Amino acid sequence: MQKYLVLVVLFTISNHICADGSAKPASPYSKSALIKIAMSAGPPSISLDATILDYDGTILRKGTNQWVCNTGGDPQRINPACLDEVWLAWNERFMAGKKNDIENQPFGQAYMLQGDVPVDNDVPASYGMDDHVKGPNTGHFHDSGPHMMFLLPRAVLEQITSDPYAGGSYVMFPNTEWEHLMVPVDDVKPSFENH
């Protein structure tokens, strides 16, 4: 847990400064509204006692369980998540461009009950792409809707479809070190316009 808090503090410090060195603008949301947004990502049995972070890593509330709920990945706060410690470490590696040992991936779990930003199911780098225009190099851009996610070793994941429209669970980012199981709790919808 101590290692986790050090990571959170370093993440928080690094995210309070813009690329040009200026301070990031203040949030238009009250602290209680931000906590409510973050808690909406998971069931109350997890989020009530979780550590709550804003999108930039600011600690809004220290928790008493091993979960972290955040307001999302950007200032719009449209994709809050609740992550266990294994998923939090996975996410930090993903965002930092580090390697992940998918063959020996320990079990991890996360909730995104408000959904996520649309991504290409096949391409991890699509997280920051323009997801509303389908081009020749885009695959399954989709809105995953409310879902749970599980980290599992490749030997388990290779038995599961990667088609987000097949119905039921599917593997996101298949055949990459970042593949993980998506468990939708609502319909998965395409997220692009045909041009």
Residue ranges and their predicted role:
Residues 5, 18-20:
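Long, low-complexity intrinsically disordered regions enriched in Ser/Thr, Asp/Glu, Pro/Gly
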Residues 2-8:
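Sec-dependent signal peptide recognition
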Residues 21-195:
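Primary mode marks residue(s) on the alpha4-beta5-alpha5 output face of response regulator receiver
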Residues 13-14:
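N-terminal signal peptide c-region/cleavage motif recognized by signal peptidases
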